[in-house]
């Protein structure tokens, strides 16, 4: 479907497009194939739109009269979406590569109504579309920050369980995806701002600059949380090392206490006939008492010296 801005938003067919007015379209792969020759799109770009990309940094392709790029869109609750963008002079075409829940299409439609039709420009539509894509991201980032703070408190209190490491890795993966997502958007907006193929009005590029600054702030927030995750990983590693050291310390203390008894047992296990304790009627009790006294003495010494 295509929409043309002429004091109001009119839905039109592809053969009714007037290049003197701003035109915005949202099409699927088959619809793109049927109109690609009319707009002069390269076959390689059309083929790219046939399947979703698994990469964020797919790059921006500049042609004489249009710009092409793919955009992988993060969706925290469902599967990620993927669209492709064709930007011509006075025209934005969004290609639905993978948008199963229709969320990206809804954001696209809301972007069309952001400004009054008579005041809408190509730069404003691009700004509104990207702004709708990242509109709720600040809340997501804040939620991740609060979750990391809770994990930090648990670690400080020593109440972490075996799932701690898994949770940290999940947060790290999510933050990395968000970082790459914002880098991808910045690649696109910076390319638009450079305006190498002269598709935009210079006095309207401030809208592109505004969305660039907003996405940069989101990226900085994500990078800050990534540093927090790294610190948590280091702290958790230190926590595990300290826990292991305490365990080894206990084993060492226990070994130190009972090692003399091992010597006593080995000593009397030699069974020499000349050993007087063998013929003494209190020999057995004597060995038991000696072992208890030695173990008790070492236990008291260890406690005073804070071995445990």
Locate each region found by the language model.
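Juxtamembrane/interface motifs at transmembrane-helix termini
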Residues: 183-191, 199, 227-229, 287-288
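Conserved HATPase_c
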Residues: 165-169, 201-212
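Residues at secondary-structure transition points
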Residues: 120-124, 202, 242
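Non-transmembrane, extramembrane segments of multi-pass ion/lipid transporters
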Residues: 158, 199-202, 262
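Peripheral, non-transmembrane regulatory/ligand-interaction domains of membrane transport proteins
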Residues: 1-195, 214-217, 307-308
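Hydrophobic alpha-helical transmembrane segments and their immediately adjacent juxtamembrane loops
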Residues: 216-308
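Generic secondary-structure boundary/loop-capping signal
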Residues: 57, 152, 189, 197, ...
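Long amphipathic alpha-helical coiled-coil segments
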Residues: 190-205, 231-241
């Amino acid at each position: 479907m295509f929409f043309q801005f002429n004091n109001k938003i009119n839905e039109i067919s592809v053969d009714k497009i007037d290049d003197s007015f701003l035109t915005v379209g949202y099409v699927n792969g088959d619809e793109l194939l049927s109109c690609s020759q009319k707009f002069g799109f390269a076959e390689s770009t059309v083929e790219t739109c046939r399947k979703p990309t698994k990469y964020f940094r797919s790059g921006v392709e500049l042609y004489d009269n249009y710009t092409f790029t793919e955009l992988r869109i993060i969706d925290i609750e469902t599967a990620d979406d993927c669209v492709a963008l064709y930007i011509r002079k006075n025209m934005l075409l969004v290609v639905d590569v993978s948008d199963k829940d229709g969320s990206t299409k809804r954001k696209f439609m809301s972007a069309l109504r952001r400004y009054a039709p008579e005041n809408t420009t190509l730069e404003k539509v691009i700004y509104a579309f990207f702004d709708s894509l990242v509109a709720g991201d600040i809340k997501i980032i804040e939620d991740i920050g609060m979750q990391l703070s809770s994990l930090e408190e648990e670690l400080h209190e020593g109440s972490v369980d075996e799932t701690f490491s898994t949770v940290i890795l999940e947060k790290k993966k999510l933050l990395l995806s968000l970082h790459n997502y914002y880098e991808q958007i910045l690649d696109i907006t910076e390319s638009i701002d450079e305006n190498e193929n002269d598709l935009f009005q210079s006095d309207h590029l401030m809208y592109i600059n505004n969305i660039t600054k907003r996405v940069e702030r989101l990226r900085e927030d994500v990078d800050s949380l990534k540093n927090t995750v790294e610190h948590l990983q280091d702290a958790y590693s230190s926590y595990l090392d300290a826990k292991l050291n305490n365990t080894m310390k206990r084993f060492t203390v226990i070994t130190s206490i009972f090692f003399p008894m091992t010597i006593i047992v080995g000593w009397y296990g030699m069974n020499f006939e000349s050993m007087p304790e063998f013929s003494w009627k209190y020999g057995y009790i004597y060995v038991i008492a000696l072992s208890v006294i030695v173990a008790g003495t070492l236990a008291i010494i260890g406690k005073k010296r804070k071995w445990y």
